[in-house]
């Protein structure tokens, strides 16, 4: 209890620091001269800062000596001490709880013993965390003589700023009786007096039952103590409990105190010469460069050994002859012994042999009758190949003693020895798959990948037969070009759905395309054996004049086609055009990005299946003397001199600058039907008759990166968007599949392909034909579709 009281006293001193500089003040009082407190008791006067100023520098050694001897101090020192008595909260009138003043302590003799205390030392120790006051009070409590003398003439430490407003006297109901026996107040209703002289009434104590209930209900009951001097219950903190335990164990109250500090032998340790050398300049560069002189010596030794000038001694030759060739374990790890290699779980070469499989329920010697094979099953087992049939058939025996020896025991052991001897061992990492959903790649949700076309917005009706091909203008997307089996070429206004112009041609239109050159505004169409070039009439006057000049024939033309004027004019309703007549029916067209070259594909043309035409020179040429396979589609690379030729089984990539085959993309099992290039030029979409759409990454491999099979019928067309990460495929099942295809600039990141929308219900399947073509709007996330039901539909976001 003394220790806990000391801890609490130190904590109170630490919480309420004095407001004036502390000075050493020592007085001696005896229990006989102390009268019980009452209304007439002398109360401490208010703090006077000038008192501490007067007592600065006074020596209190005499007072300390007088207190120890039990005599009074000299008069002059007593006067000084009387002035110090009113100095402030550090005076004797505030009781032992504040670390100042003097009182009585029960000693071994049974009566009150004189107590001598230095207020400055105790309070200064309290400001350092309470450890000094707690230690001194504890030492005083355990002294055999029972007396307490803690005046070590230590230098006082300056307290807080005198101008501070904080003071311990402001604490209400503060007990100022001092460290006197509480038995004096045993029969009184009060315990001490406050700073105003009023009695401090005792608090109502709890009975035993209430104390027992509080101890069971509260977790803080075991570390709650009763302070009899202030008549209150105090809960000790964890730090204070640790301090009490350390004091009881005879240790320092605080862990920060190190009784065995490291001794520094500055300039006396002989090792200091190594740490602090006399010369500490940086190492020269020559220390880090191989020595040339050592290299010359090594070269001389090597030359002498090669020429036989340096020979081994007879003793060395005899030792090598006796040792023989070095022997080592072939399958052991380098640098490891046999035991270490056997114990190494992650060895480089050693892998323990797999254990034999334990017998299961199928090897039971007396299985149920329904598990025994019939005669037909036995005959089938005997006729089957030994590698495909089970090792043994179930048999029934009356007891385990009747089971004969296993006939294939030696054979199986021999095969196991062969496996251990010849077959390499491989560690297979087992996949920790908790659920099948972990095998499915985590794709983003479609609503997070918007915008993409979702809703049918407009229908363009006017064709009298199936629409074979469509193409929006590549600049503004204001106009849409379409060609159908009814022999008409129509130009539509996208926003209104009005047919702005119609050309009636000689036969069915199989393909349409715009010239990419913005200053011409030409349209092209494949009609039978001809490729027709017509002015669109949608541009300004300068574009119309440039188109008329481009369509003027300057020469007879040469190469694989015959350039004529007036052919389309005879079958057109307005305007003059230009036609390139070929030998075989044309099925598709492809323009170069600059708008001067375009290629036509005639699948039945054999050696003239692919013809490249130049508009500025009116020339046509056949780039291939021999085609390996039937050509289906062609395309120009948007930025590089590459030419893509899709046959029924492969996609060949030719370098036009080197006139050589650059790459060959391998197809699947189906016949290729459509082709599309990514605007970046590094990715290719190919549709085939096996209902698949293959995505090729030219920088990754010649095999498909992804094979998408979402259609129930062969795809007829594929298309990329020019500005949005979208691509689509149209098939004969009447649906259009829209995908999110993000291509990253980082070559180490694979493209992200996510199906986002299925556009269905717009087209009707007619004669096993559904959607014939699809094309994206050049600037908006819209898509145009053309079907065999003579409809052209626009889907918007």
UniProtKB/Swiss-Prot annotation:
GO molecular function annotations of the record:
ribonucleoprotein complex binding
Sequence segments annotated as region (Disordered): 22-112, 149-177
Q: Name one GO biological process term.
A: maturation of LSU-rRNA from tricistronic rRNA transcript (SSU-rRNA, 5.8S rRNA, LSU-rRNA)
Instruction: List all Acidic residues biased stretches.
Output: 74-87
Point to the regions of Gly residues compositional bias. Answer: 90-112
Renumbered to this chain, the Low complexity biased-composition regions fall at 61-73
Mind telling me which InterPro entries this protein's record contains? BOP1/Erb1, BOP1_N_dom, WD40/YVTN_repeat-like_dom_sf, WD40_repeat_CS, WD40_repeat_dom_sf, WD40_rpt
SMART domains, alphabetically?
Answer: BOP1NT (SM01035), WD40 (SM00320)
WD repeats located where?
Answer: 462-502, 504-544, 581-623, 626-664, 667-706, 710-749, 766-797
> Subcellular location, in the record's words?
Nucleus, Nucleolus; Nucleus, Nucleoplasm
Output the Gene3D superfamilies linked to this UniProt entry: YVTN repeat-like/Quinoprotein amine dehydrogenase (2.130.10.10)
Q: What Gene Ontology terms describe where this protein resides (cellular component)?
A: nucleolus; nucleoplasm; preribosome, large subunit precursor
Which keywords does UniProt give here? Nucleus, Repeat, Ribosome biogenesis, rRNA processing, WD repeat
Kindly give the SUPFAM superfamilies that the UniProt entry links to this protein.
WD40 repeat-like (SSF50978)
Q: What role does this protein play?
A: Required for maturation of ribosomal RNAs and formation of the large ribosomal subunit.
Return the similarity comment: Belongs to the WD repeat BOP1/ERB1 family.
* Protein name stated in the entry: Ribosome biogenesis protein BOP1 homolog
């Amino acid at each position: 209890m003394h220790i806990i009281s000391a801890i609490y006293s130190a904590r109170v001193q630490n919480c309420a620091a004095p407001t004036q500089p502390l000075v050493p003040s020592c007085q001696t009082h005896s229990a006989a001269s102390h009268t019980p407190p009452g209304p007439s008791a002398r109360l401490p006067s208010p703090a006077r800062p000038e008192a501490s100023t007067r007592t600065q520098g006074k020596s209190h050694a005499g007072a300390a000596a007088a207190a120890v001897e039990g005599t009074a101090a000299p008069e002059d020192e007593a006067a000084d001490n009387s002035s110090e008595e009113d100095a402030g909260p550090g005076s004797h009138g505030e009781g032992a709880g504040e670390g100042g003043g003097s009182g009585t302590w029960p000693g071994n003799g049974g009566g009150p013993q004189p107590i001598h205390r230095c207020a400055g030392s105790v309070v200064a120790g309290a400001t350092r965390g309470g450890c000094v006051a707690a230690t001194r009070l504890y030492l005083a409590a355990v002294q055999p003589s029972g007396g307490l003398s803690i005046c070590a003439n230590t230098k006082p430490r300056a307290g807080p700023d005198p101008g501070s407003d904080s003071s311990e006297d402001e604490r209400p109901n503060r007990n100022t009786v001092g460290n006197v026996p509480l038995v004096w107040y045993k029969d009184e209703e009060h315990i001490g007096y406050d700073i105003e002289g009023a009695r401090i009434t005792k608090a109502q104590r709890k009975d035993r039952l209430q104390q027992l209930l509080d101890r069971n209900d509260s977790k803080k009951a075991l570390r709650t103590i009763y302070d009899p001097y202030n008549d209150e219950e105090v809960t000790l903190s964890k730090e204070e409990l640790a301090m009490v335990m350390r004091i009881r164990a005879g240790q320092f109250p605080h862990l920060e105190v190190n009784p065995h500090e490291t001794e520094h032998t500055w300039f006396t340790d002989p090792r200091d010469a190594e740490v602090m050398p006399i010369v500490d300049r940086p190492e020269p560069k020559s220390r880090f460069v191989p020595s040339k002189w050592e290299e010359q010596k090594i070269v001389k030794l090597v030359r002498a050994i090669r020429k036989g000038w340096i020979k081994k001694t007879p003793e060395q030759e005899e030792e090598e002859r006796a040792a023989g060739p070095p022997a080592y374990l072939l399958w052991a790890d380098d640098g490891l012994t046999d035991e270490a290699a056997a114990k190494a779980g992650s060895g480089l070469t050693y892998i323990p042999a797999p254990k034999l499989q334990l017998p299961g329920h199928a090897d039971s010697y007396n299985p149920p009758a329904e598990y025994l094979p019939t005669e037909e099953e036995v005959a089938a087992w005997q006729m089957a190949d030994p590698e495909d049939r089970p090792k043994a058939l179930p048999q029934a025996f009356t007891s385990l003693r009747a089971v004969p020896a296993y006939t294939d025991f030696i054979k199986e052991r021999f095969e196991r020895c062969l496996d251990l001897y010849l077959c390499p061992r491989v560690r297979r990492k087992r996949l920790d798959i908790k659920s099948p959903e972990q095998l499915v790649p985590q794709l983003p949700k479609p609503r997070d990948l918007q915008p993409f076309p979702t809703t049918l917005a407009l229908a363009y009706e006017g064709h009298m037969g199936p629409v074979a091909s469509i193409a929006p203008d590549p600049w503004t997307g204001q106009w849409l070009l379409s060609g159908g089996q009814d022999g008409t070429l129509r130009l539509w206004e996208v926003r209104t759905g009005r047919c702005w112009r119609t050309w009636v041609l000689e036969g069915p239109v199989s393909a349409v395309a715009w010239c990419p050159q913005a200053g011409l505004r030409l349209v092209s169409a494949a009609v039978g054996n001809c490729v027709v070039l017509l002015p669109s009439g949608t541009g300004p006057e300068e574009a119309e004049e440039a188109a008329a000049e481009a369509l003027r024939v300057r020469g007879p033309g040469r190469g694989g086609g015959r350039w004529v004027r007036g052919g389309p004019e005879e079958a057109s309703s307005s305007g003059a055009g230009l036609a390139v007549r070929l030998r075989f029916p044309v099925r598709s067209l492809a323009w170069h990005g600059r708008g001067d070259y375009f290629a036509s594909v005639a699948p039945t043309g054999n050696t003239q299946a692919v013809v490249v035409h130049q508009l500025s020179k009116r020339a046509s040429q056949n780039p291939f003397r021999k085609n390996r396979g039937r050509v289906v589609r062609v395309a120009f690379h948007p930025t590089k001199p590459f030419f893509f030729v899709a046959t029924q089984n492969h996609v060949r990539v030719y370098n036009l600058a080197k006139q050589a085959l650059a790459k060959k993309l391998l197809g699947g099992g189906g016949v290729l039907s459509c082709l599309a290039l990514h605007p970046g030029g590094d990715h290719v979409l190919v549709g085939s008759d096996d209902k698949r759409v293959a995505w090729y990454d030219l920088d990754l491999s010649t095999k498909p990166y992804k094979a998408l099979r979402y259609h129930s019928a062969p795809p007829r067309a594929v298309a990329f968007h020019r500005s949005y990460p979208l691509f689509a495929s149209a098939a004969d099942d009447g649906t259009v599949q829209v995908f999110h295809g993000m291509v990253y600039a980082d070559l180490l990141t694979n493209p992200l392909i996510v199906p986002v929308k299925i556009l269905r219900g717009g087209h009707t399947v007619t004669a096993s034909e559904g959607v014939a073509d699809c094309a994206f709007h050049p600037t908006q996330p819209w898509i145009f579709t053309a079907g065999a039901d003579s409809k052209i539909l626009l889907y918007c976001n």
